[in-house]
């Protein structure tokens, strides 16, 4: 049983923390940290990546898309394959690191392949029970303050992957981390299900509405 009595707590910059927690750096976690530019030089990216405003092979996931919940930029199959170091499968933690620094999202699962856009970094835990703990940590007050503490640049705030990997993080013991994961996992899965249902409804609306407007679809006999 977890004991959080004061005699088992340590005073830290984050306040009182159980002495059983480990203080690590992000770079010491079993975690893949990558971004768009990990795939090559700016010249090679320009030569091999083409963005489209109409549907194509894969989604190009940007910070603005994650904020709005609408995904309207795409890449072709060649671009997607070239960007293999930043492929998204859903469930990754995405953090904006240029401009709007510190926005944190869980990558949704969409109906096409996905690849990471620019100005954001992606975290893919190799240990499943780290996923939601890390997401909440970076959304939380202290996680946010740590991220804001490493941003530089006057005209356009930003931070780099190296500084991010050097940030401290408190990690609970494995048994407590697993308990936490099992408690919050159903909540996040329900959110995912609702998001997928919303996407399906949006696709249905976008298919039917033009047919209604053009009188191609007759609903005059439908009883409400």
Stretches found by the model and what they are:
Residues 1-44, 166, 170, 174-215, ...:
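Non-catalytic DNA-recognition/assembly elements of restriction-modification systems
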Residues 27-50, 59, 63-90:
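Sequence-specific dsDNA recognition surfaces
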Residues 34-39, 131-132, 145:
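Acidic/polar loop patches that form or flank catalytic/metal-binding clefts of enzymes
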Residues 62-63, 82-143, 150-155, 160-161:
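A short beta-sheet element
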Residues 78-81, 110, 123, 186-192:
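Short, contiguous acidic/charged loop-to-helix segments that flank catalytic cores in large enzymes
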Residues 121, 132, 148, 165-171, ...:
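Glycine-rich beta->alpha junctions and the first turn(s) of the following alpha-helix
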